[in-house]
């Protein structure tokens, strides 16, 4: 009865500034949890969110699973 893959999937966007400078300046890597519709956004999602380790709004990209 199932049609295959689910259309809505859970993704984890990650701060690219913390990921790039890991170990040097910041204490950790900021990650959020959200959902996306695979049919409407087939490419990787980029969101501008607040990173508590950087202390500013940065771009968060969807990670590989």
From Swiss-Prot:
So which domain of life are we looking at? Eukaryota
Q: Which residues form a coiled coil?
A: none
Q: Under the cellular component aspect of Gene Ontology, which terms does the record hold?
A: plastid; ribonucleoprotein complex; ribosome
**Chief location of this protein?**
plastid
User: Which biological process annotations from GO are given for this protein?
Assistant: translation
Question: In which compartments does the protein localize?
Answer: Plastid
UniProt keyword list: Plastid, Ribonucleoprotein, Ribosomal protein
The reply to whether Cell membrane figures as a keyword in the UniProt entry is no
InterPro entries referenced in this protein's UniProt entry, alphabetically? Ribosomal_bL33, Ribosomal_bL33_CS, Ribosomal_bL33_sf, Ribosomal_zn-bd
Task: Please tell me whether the keyword Heme is annotated for this protein.
Answer: no
For this protein, what is any one GO molecular function term? Answer: structural constituent of ribosome
Q: Tell me the protein family, please.
A: Belongs to the bacterial ribosomal protein bL33 family.
Under PANTHER family, the record lists: 50S RIBOSOMAL PROTEIN L33, CHLOROPLASTIC (PTHR43168), LARGE RIBOSOMAL SUBUNIT PROTEIN BL33C (PTHR43168:SF2)
Q: State the protein's name.
A: Large ribosomal subunit protein bL33c
């Amino acid at each position: 009865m199932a049609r295959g893959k689910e259309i809505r999937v859970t993704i984890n966007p990650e701060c690219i500034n913390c990921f790039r400078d890991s170990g040097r300046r910041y204490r950790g890597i900021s990650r959020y949890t959200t959902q996306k519709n695979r049919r409407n956004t087939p490419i990787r999602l980029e969101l501008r969110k607040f990173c508590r380790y950087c202390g500013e709004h940065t771009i968060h990209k969807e990670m590989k699973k």
